[in-house]
């Protein structure tokens, strides 16, 4: 059964004017390694910590600024939001299609809230806490190409022609601001697009981004802004002492116009200095140590890295299943070919390396979770190949072969073919990242014994479900298994309204 909304009634939950407060008991464990008389043992002790959550329920007018607004992802997202807002329908070869937000966790998925008369009851994910309606978002952004959003949509070749014709009047007046362009960080083949760039030194470019954010906020009268990088994958930046290892060194390097400070890092610095959340949707190491340090000092949300949309999402499910079932993956070979601008940029070895790292690390935590299957240091052979094939356009082909060891020396091979409509999968993920980042800034919490409420850690692990290479605070375990990531996100939101985590025990029927 499906219900549109619900209200929690509990002595530990209070709905006030503009806020929800909850008292929540967090049940976990602590491990102790004890030694007695030369013998050692592990002891697991149940542990409970009481938390107080406070969520601001006033939904702001939210502005979204995309770096790479005129790219395939940006133009597709813009088109989708307009089509939903205006209730547009269009003819395909199969049917008359209605606009929707399929593929969005916040807009098109559900959560279980309990059971009624023996039937499980589900409600929209977005009903847990008040969120910004995507139809109300105000968009803007930067691009190194001056092409307006209507022409960018046509260039992308993602959406049906009938839909494009209906959207053109809404989008042809939308033009991106000049963007930061450094040909050393992306493929040389992107130079032909770069006719709309911010001139000057790196410091001047960063200051222009700050100015752009302020003017966008003032012009559109928005309460908050979230900035998201959906531009080209950059090569990895060098990280070294004295260059970008601390906030002081990073800012000094910007002042000195150091060549190794990437455009994405400049955007991120500008956002952090303005107190604006910044999300990195590409695989490069935007968040160098000095930038993470700056975000923590300024208590400004940062999140990333790299949208998790197609092949990697499948991998994070399948490997989790195999290892959890006691099956040992020994070889994972992933092949992709695509023909959009992302594929053209990734045809350069230095930018492909960033993507290869992001895609390859996704199974690490699952492998390390099972020492029965894997010896220390042992890891599946894992190869990732990406090729540029212009004809297939945005319709990326992903082919995977998983070879595993099974019972008594047997071998199992699974082969998958996945046609990933790249931008149509990524656009709703961008939407979720923006909405959840904004929501995160309205949640405060404190553990028992702490003096005052505080925000989540600025490094937003809550966004991990949506990214290939989750950015986590120093010393925090990295979790890539998709089911764990979704459970973490959902259960934190449940805690904000005093609901227990969804553990699927269903003891009332046992």
Swiss-Prot record:
GO molecular function: inositol-3-phosphate synthase activity
Main enzyme class: isomerase
Reactions catalysed: D-glucose 6-phosphate = 1D-myo-inositol 3-phosphate
Domain of life according to the entry: Eukaryota
EC identifiers of the protein: 5.5.1.4
Keyword terms of this UniProt record: Cytoplasm, Inositol biosynthesis, Isomerase, Lipid biosynthesis, Lipid metabolism, NAD, Nucleus, Phospholipid biosynthesis, Phospholipid metabolism
GO cellular component: cytosol; nucleus
Pfam families: Inos-1-P_synth (PF01658), NAD_binding_5 (PF07994)
Sequence intervals crossing the membrane: none
Name this polypeptide is given: Inositol-3-phosphate synthase
Keyword Iron-sulfur: no
Known function: Key enzyme in myo-inositol biosynthesis pathway that catalyzes the conversion of glucose 6-phosphate to 1-myo-inositol 1-phosphate in a NAD-dependent manner.
One GO term (biological process): inositol biosynthetic process
Location of the protein in the cell: Cytoplasm, Cytosol; Nucleus
Pathway: Polyol metabolism; myo-inositol biosynthesis; myo-inositol from D-glucose 6-phosphate: step 1/2
InterPro entries in UniProt: Myo-inos-1-P_Synthase, Myo-inos-1-P_Synthase_GAPDH, NAD(P)-bd_dom_sf
Family: Belongs to the myo-inositol 1-phosphate synthase family.
Principal localisation: cytoplasm
Positions contributing to NAD(+) binding: 70-73, 143, 180, 190, 193, 230-233, 281-282, 306, 309, 340-342, 355, 393-394, 422-423
Obligatory cofactor(s): NAD(+)
């Amino acid at each position: 059964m499906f219900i549109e909304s619900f209200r929690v009634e509990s002595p530990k939950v209070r709905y006030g004017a503009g806020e929800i407060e909850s008292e929540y008991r967090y049940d976990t464990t602590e491990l102790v390694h004890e030694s007695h008389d030369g013998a050692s043992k592990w002891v697991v002790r149940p542990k409970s910590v009481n938390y107080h959550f406070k969520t601001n329920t006033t939904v702001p007018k939210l502005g979204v600024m995309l770096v790479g607004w005129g790219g395939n992802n940006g133009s597709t997202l813009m088109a989708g939001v307009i089509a939903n807002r205006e209730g547009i329908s269009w003819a395909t070869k199969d049917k008359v299609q209605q606009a929707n937000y399929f593929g969005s966790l916040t807009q098109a998925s559900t959560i279980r809230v309990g059971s009624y008369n023996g039937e499980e009851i589900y409600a929209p994910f977005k009903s847990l806490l008040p969120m910004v309606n995507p139809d109300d978002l105000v968009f803007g952004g930067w691009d190194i190409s001056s092409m307006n959003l209507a022409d960018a949509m046509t260039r992308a070749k993602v959406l049906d022609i009938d839909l494009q014709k209906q959207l053109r009047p809404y989008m042809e007046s939308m033009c991106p601001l000049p963007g930061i362009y450094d040909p050393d960080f992306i493929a040389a083949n992107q130079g032909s697009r770069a006719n709309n760039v911010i001139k000057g030194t790196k410091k001047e470019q960063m200051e222009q981004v700050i100015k752009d954010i302020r003017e966008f906020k003032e012009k559109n009268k928005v309460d908050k802004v979230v900035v998201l990088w959906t531009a080209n994958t950059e090569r990895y930046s060098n990280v070294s002492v004295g260059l970008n290892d601390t906030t002081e060194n990073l800012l000094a390097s910007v002042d000195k116009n150091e060549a190794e400070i990437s455009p994405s890092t400049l955007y991120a610095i500008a956002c952090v200095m303005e107190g604006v959340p910044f999300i990195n949707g590409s695989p490069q190491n935007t968040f160098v140590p000095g930038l993470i340090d700056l975000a923590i000092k300024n208590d400004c949300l940062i999140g990333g890295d790299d949208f998790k949309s197609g092949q990697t999402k499948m991998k994070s499910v399948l490997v989790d299943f195999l290892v959890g079932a006691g099956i040992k993956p020994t070889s994972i070979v992933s092949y992709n070919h695509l023909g959009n601008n992302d594929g053209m940029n990734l045809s350069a070895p230095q930018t492909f390396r960033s993507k290869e790292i992001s895609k390859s690390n996704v199974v690490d935590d699952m492998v390390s979770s099972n020492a029965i299957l894997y010896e220390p240091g042992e890891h599946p052979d894992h190869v990732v190949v990406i090729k540029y094939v212009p004809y297939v356009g945005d319709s990326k082909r992903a082919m995977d072969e998983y070879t595993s060891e099974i019972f008594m020396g047997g071998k199992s091979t699974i082969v998958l073919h996945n046609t990933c409509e790249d931008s149509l999968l990524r656009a709703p993920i961008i939407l979720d990242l923006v909405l959840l980042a904004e929501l995160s800034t309205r949640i405060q919490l404190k553990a028992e014994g702490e003096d005052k409420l505080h925000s989540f850690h600025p490094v937003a692990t809550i966004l991990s479900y949506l990214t290939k290479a989750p950015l986590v605070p120093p010393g925090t375990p990295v979790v890539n298994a998709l089911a764990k990531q979704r459970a973490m996100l959902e259960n934190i939101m449940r805690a904000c309204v005093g609901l227990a985590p969804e553990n699927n025990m269903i003891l009332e029927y046992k």
